[in-house]
A protein has these predicted regions:
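Short, surface-exposed beta-strand-loop junctions and turns on beta-sheet-rich folds
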Residues: 68, 84-86, 116
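Short, conserved beta-strand element in jelly-roll/cupin
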Residues: 55, 64-78, 82
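A short hydrophobic beta-strand segment most commonly corresponding to one strand
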Residues: 100, 113-123
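A short, N-terminal "cap"/entry segment at the start of jelly-roll beta-barrel domains
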Residues: 1-52, 91
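Short solvent-exposed loop/turn micro-motifs enriched in small/polar/acidic residues
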Residues: 33-35, 61-63, 92, 100-102
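Short acidic-glycine-tyrosine-enriched beta hairpin
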Residues: 83-103
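Short, exposed beta-strand-loop hairpins at the edges of beta-sheets
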Residues: 106-111
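Conserved short histidine dyad/triad with adjacent acidic residue
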Residues: 44-64, 103
Length: 123
């Protein structure tokens, strides 16, 4: 996969219009619906990966990496789960929100339509 904003170039792209190829989320990570997701890699900054991630139509689980993200469009309900799978707390994010995720956090994302975010994450 090529980077949309490789190092050494002064360039800009539209975060809303950038092509993100979507594929089905694995059955093991799907809780409800028929979610699809994808990533468009933008590049790397100081060893951290930067990209656009999109999720559509469903509920999925994930184990997070250290990450900071900005929601470009859409929104999600993110439930933070204990080791036993009980909801510890919930965060709602919408376009314009900035959020930090801590490595190892277990989450459940519910997306009615879509969420598209720009992320900076440990590689």
């Amino acid at each position: 996969m090529s980077e949309l904003l490789p190092a050494g170039n002064n360039a800009a792209i539209s975060g809303h219009a950038a092509a993100v190829e979507l594929a089905a989320v694995s059955a093991a990570d799907t809780v409800a619906g028929t979610p699809v997701q994808g990533i468009a890699e933008l590049g790397e900054i100081a060893g951290a990966g930067v990209g656009i991630w999109e999720l559509r139509g469903g509920t999925v689980t994930d184990t997070e990496v250290e990450e900071l993200f900005v929601v470009l469009s859409g929104g999600a309900t993110i439930e933070f789960l204990t080791e036993s799978g009980v909801v510890d707390h919930t965060v709602e994010v919408v376009a314009g929100d900035v959020m930090r995720l801590t490595a190892g956090s277990r989450t459940r994302w519910t997306v009615a339509d879509h969420i598209r975010k720009v992320y900076i994450a440990e590689a």
